[in-house]
Amino acid sequence: MEPELDCHHAAQARQAIAEAECVIALTAYKSEALEHADVLLPIAPFTETSGTYMSMEGRVQSFTAVTKPLGECRPGWKVLRVLGNTLGLSGFDFDSSEQVKNAIFGGQKPSTVVWNSLNNNLRELIEIQVKIKSNVLQRLGEVPQFQSDAIVRRSPPLQKTRAVQAPVAAMHSQLLTELGLDDGEMVTVKQGVASVLLKAKRDDGLPHGVVRVPTALPVTSLLGDLMGEIEVTRA
């Protein structure tokens, strides 16, 4: 994960890192936000290590490395194991990622544990009160197809595809009219104290009052919440 691109509030993440007394980063890639890091521990991406992922639907998927880690990189679980052992902590005596998985699932079948403990079924209904301001614009912060993680962001072939477009501030044609804007006009998009310049784009598939501004991009990483109040004015 790259905090300045992957966090829900990228600007807040940047500030927290900059103000922290000590920053230790386990990462496969060096990014701008990590200039504040006191220690960088190189870990291998998933292609260079074995491990297990659990998808959003609760599906457990294990895999093996396709190649050896580059240079001094090590699998993340090994780095954590060494740190745990060095600090004299218990629960870090593992020799393989398979042992880590077994410890998590307690020797049971992952599917059984997921079904009983980690599924998304509602156990009870909770009533919540939501206050929505109808007189302000709301940001819809989507993640572009090839900006979803550090690997695809650094893939030259993927970044040259037609799917990769310059970020825009998309909104319904009625909203464009109300704001006195034209399709294709440059606008100032502001969240909190941060603002960026983007091109306005008509998209009648969006609800009125919603402005779609992509996230996980350097140009929009200075903005605030992915889903929150937003201001749009002529540049």
Indicate where each model-derived feature is located:
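A cross-kingdom feature strongest in bacterial/archaeal respiratory oxidoreductases
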Residues: 1-72, 79-81, 86-89, 98-235
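Alpha-helix N-cap recognition
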Residues: 94-96
